[in-house]
Amino acid sequence: MKNPTKKKTPAARPKPLALRSQAWFDNPANADMTALYLERTMNFGLGFDELQSGRPIIGIAQTGSDIAPCNRHHLVLAERVREGIRDAGGIAFEFPIHPIQETCKRPTAALDRNLQYLSLVEVLYGYPIDGVVLTTGCDKTTPAQLMAAATVDIPAIALNSGPMLNGWYEGERTGSGTIVWRAREMMAAGKIGYQEFLKLVASSAPRLFCVV
């Protein structure tokens, strides 16, 4: 006869996973899915030993593209980021996110910011990423990516390259963006022609993202 007062020995709790990505690549409690994810991810050129090495997988959220010149410099900077991740012992996964180029697509700044936020949340939540480097720039890309990282609650570093430098035109400073309104007034008053208007405006956008 069983002793009703005898306490049952509680089952041993599984050890918590050290890294988020272990749920995909090194989870003894779910061996079949681990094997499936390993097979799929090896297509990226990563080996079995690398994926189960205990090294963190760090994402690089890439905002740069030819369609978004405001952040195109991040295509070059991401190579430095990748090298830094590797040298620190991590594994880099670079991926694109929704582009934002407000000067070509108006008035949709808030919509594009929200789309970038939503798309980044889906990537960070659904893929084996332990931390992420955010390639930010303007007042849309920065909050969109910071909110996404906070929503998924994973470690993040924001790499912001800084605002656009002021330009020069015929020996005088042309402010980033503000010269556009002055140039329009000058052309309307007949002080400059159409071609000079274009040159004056173009001089105010030498590189990086605008500060308007």
What do the PLM-derived regions correspond to, one by one?
Residues 35-41, 69-80:
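Glycine-rich anion/phosphate-binding loops
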Residues 110-212:
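Active-site cavity-forming subdomains of large catalytic enzyme subunits
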Residues 63-71, 136-142:
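Gly/Ser/Thr-rich loops at beta-strand to alpha-helix junctions
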Residues 2-55:
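N-terminal amphipathic/basic leader segments beginning at the initiator methionine
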Residues 49-59, 87-96:
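N-terminal glycine-rich anion-binding loops that anchor highly charged ligand groups
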Residues 40, 44, 79, 114-118, ...:
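Short, contiguous clusters of charged residues that form electrostatic/catalytic patches at enzyme active sites
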Residues 27-31, 73-113:
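Anionic-ligand anchoring segments at beta-strand to alpha-helix junctions in alpha/beta enzyme folds, i.e.
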Residues 17-28, 58-65, 95-107, 124, ...:
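Gly-rich Lys/Arg/Thr-decorated short loops/hinges at beta-loop-alpha junctions or inter-strand turns
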